[in-house]
Swiss-Prot record:
Protein keywords: Electron transport, Membrane, Mitochondrion, Mitochondrion inner membrane, Respiratory chain, Transmembrane, Transmembrane helix, Transport
Residues passing through the membrane, by range: 16-41
Protein's name according to its UniProt entry: Cytochrome b-c1 complex subunit 9
Oligomeric form and interacting partners: Component of the ubiquinol-cytochrome c oxidoreductase (cytochrome b-c1 complex, complex III, CIII), a multisubunit enzyme composed of 3 respiratory subunits cytochrome b, cytochrome c1 and Rieske protein, 2 core protein subunits, and additional low-molecular weight protein subunits. The complex exists as an obligatory dimer and forms supercomplexes (SCs) in the inner mitochondrial membrane with cytochrome c oxidase (complex IV, CIV).
Membrane topology: Single-pass membrane protein
PANTHER family: CYTOCHROME B-C1 COMPLEX SUBUNIT 9 (PTHR12980:SF0), UBIQUINOL-CYTOCHROME C REDUCTASE COMPLEX, SUBUNIT X (PTHR12980)
UniProt KW Transmembrane helix keyword: yes
SUPFAM superfamilies found in the cross-reference section: Subunit X (non-heme 7 kDa protein) of cytochrome bc1 complex (Ubiquinol-cytochrome c reductase)
A GO CC annotation given for this chain: respiratory chain complex III
Amino acid sequence: MKVIYNTLFKRTSTYAVAIIASAFFFERALDVTSVAIFEGINKGKLWKDIKGKYE
C-alpha cells in the first residue's frame, strides 16, 4: 500500500494524472461493454445486419 501511495498519491500532479487515466480507461471499457450488450440484444434489427437486403 505504501508503494502505491508513494508513486501515485503523494504528489498532486501524479494523482491527477492517475485519475484522468483511470477515467479514460473506465469510459472506454464501459462504452465497449454497453455497445456489445446493445448489439447483442438488437441482433438482426440493426442496419449492419439488414443492409444486405437493400443493396
